[in-house]
């Protein structure tokens, strides 16, 4: 563990790591300070950083398992101590480190009896395991077990949607969140109008990256969000008597749904749930948080309603329609 005394600069804004430790292979802790800040700035930065650390960071997870040995995900396999559900839960706990984009395949192919750990996973070159000792299963008899794994990099979380059971493929709830927790606190000093603040930021990670790396990545993500404002043309717009008010062009949302209804009259949209569509995790989570559970719910929302959904974009509607038209 590394711990340093806090020295406050009275002039230049500076940040510093004042405590760093590794509690285990899958738990890192870091404590940072930023000072000096004017009154109110510490809370503004602290809230933004915490949200960026917990919601904007990308992680790598096992998202799907495929094996001819598994009849269904709540079954038991002769010669294996754990149930299939327990094996899937153990695979869900595996912590991976990578910078991959898209998806990759991995493989477990072992012969019993013996213990299967994360060390037995055959990974692509771009992926590595944080803790090789993580337990997966126990083979009690001399059987062969081969399991195919799908690895993805994303952010947030992805709820499993069981729709490919015919090919013995089983999804896993994936949590793409390398930062397990983040807190901020504020210390004020000085008197009167000269009062200043120190921001303390605590970060816990799962070992796939260090707290310092997480802080840098979250900072870059926040900077990228604000960059477009730096390029806004310096023009002043005056809206007098609504003369220059611009109406958003009608997005052909309902038109495309109407065409879908004509082609697929047998579909009852109120019975088609968004869980069935294999939507990207961000789109799925946005809709769920807005109580949109079926296609009918989606259709009953106006363009203005959809745009008001946090983190939801017009392009996301197009993605949903593209998926529907392929069904």
UniProtKB/Swiss-Prot annotation:
Coiled-coil boundaries: none
Function per UniProt: DNA-dependent RNA polymerase catalyzes the transcription of DNA into RNA using the four ribonucleoside triphosphates as substrates.
EC number: 2.7.7.6
Primary enzyme class: transferase
Identification of the protein by name: DNA-directed RNA polymerase subunit alpha
SUPFAM superfamilies (alphabetical): C-terminal domain of RNA polymerase alpha subunit (SSF47789), Insert subdomain of RNA polymerase alpha subunit (SSF56553), RBP11-like subunits of RNA polymerase (SSF55257)
Signal peptide segment: none
Catalytic activity as recorded in UniProt: RNA(n) + a ribonucleoside 5'-triphosphate = RNA(n+1) + diphosphate
Subcellular localization(s) per the UniProt record: Plastid, Chloroplast
Family membership: Belongs to the RNA polymerase alpha chain family.
InterPro entries in UniProt: DNA-dir_RNA_pol_insert, DNA-dir_RNA_pol_RpoA/D/Rpb3, DNA-dir_RpoA, RBP11-like, RNAP_asu_C, RNApol_insert_sf
Primary location group: plastid
Entry keywords, A to Z: Chloroplast, DNA-directed RNA polymerase, Nucleotidyltransferase, Plastid, Transcription, Transferase
Gene assigned in the entry: rpoA
GO biological process, one term: DNA-templated transcription
Subunit composition and interactions: In plastids the minimal PEP RNA polymerase catalytic core is composed of four subunits: alpha, beta, beta', and beta''. When a (nuclear-encoded) sigma factor is associated with the core the holoenzyme is formed, which can initiate transcription.
Region (Alpha N-terminal domain (alpha-NTD)), start-end ranges: 1-233
GO terms for MF: DNA binding; DNA-directed RNA polymerase activity; protein dimerization activity
Domain topic, free-text comment: The N-terminal domain is essential for RNAP assembly and basal transcription, whereas the C-terminal domain is involved in interaction with transcriptional regulators and with upstream promoter elements.
SMART domains membership: RPOLD
GO CC, alphabetical: chloroplast; DNA-directed RNA polymerase complex; mitochondrion
């Amino acid at each position: 563990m590394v711990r340093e005394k806090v020295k406050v600069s009275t002039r230049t804004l500076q940040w510093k790591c004042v405590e760093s430790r590794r509690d285990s292979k899958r738990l890192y802790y870091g404590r940072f300070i930023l000072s000096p800040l004017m009154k109110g700035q510490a809370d503004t930065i602290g809230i933004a950083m915490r949200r960026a650390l917990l919601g904007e960071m990308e992680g790598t997870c096992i998202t799907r398992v495929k094996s001819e040995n598994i009849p269904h995900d709540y079954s038991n396999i002769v010669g294996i101590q754990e149930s299939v559900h327990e094996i899937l839960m153990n695979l869900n706990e595996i912590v991976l480190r990578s910078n991959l984009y898209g998806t990759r395949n991995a493989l477990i192919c072992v012969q019993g009896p013996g213990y299967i750990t994360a060390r037995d996973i055959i990974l692509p070159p771009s992926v590595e395991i944080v803790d090789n000792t993580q337990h997966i299963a126990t083979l009690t008899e001399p059987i062969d077990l081969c399991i195919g794994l799908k690895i993805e990099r994303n952010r947030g979380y992805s709820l499993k949607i069981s729709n490919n059971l015919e090919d013995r493929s089983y999804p896993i709830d994936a949590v793409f969140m390398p930062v397990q927790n983040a807190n901020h606190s504020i210390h004020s000093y000085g008197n009167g109008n000269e009062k200043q603040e120190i921001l303390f930021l605590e970060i816990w990670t799962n070992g796939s990256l260090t707290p310092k790396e997480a802080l840098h990545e979250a900072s870059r993500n926040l900077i990228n969000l604000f960059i477009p404002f730096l390029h806004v043309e310096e023009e002043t717009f005056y809206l007098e008597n609504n003369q220059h008010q611009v109406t958003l062009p009608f997005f052909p949302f309902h038109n495309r749904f109407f065409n879908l209804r004509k082609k697929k009259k047998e579909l009852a949209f109120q019975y088609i749930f968004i869980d069935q569509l294999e939507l990207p995790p961000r789109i799925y989570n946005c809709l769920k948080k807005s109580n949109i559970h079926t296609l009918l719910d989606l259709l009953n929302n106006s363009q203005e309603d959809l745009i008001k959904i946090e983190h939801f974009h017009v392009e996301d509607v197009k993605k949903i329609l593209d998926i529907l038209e392929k069904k």
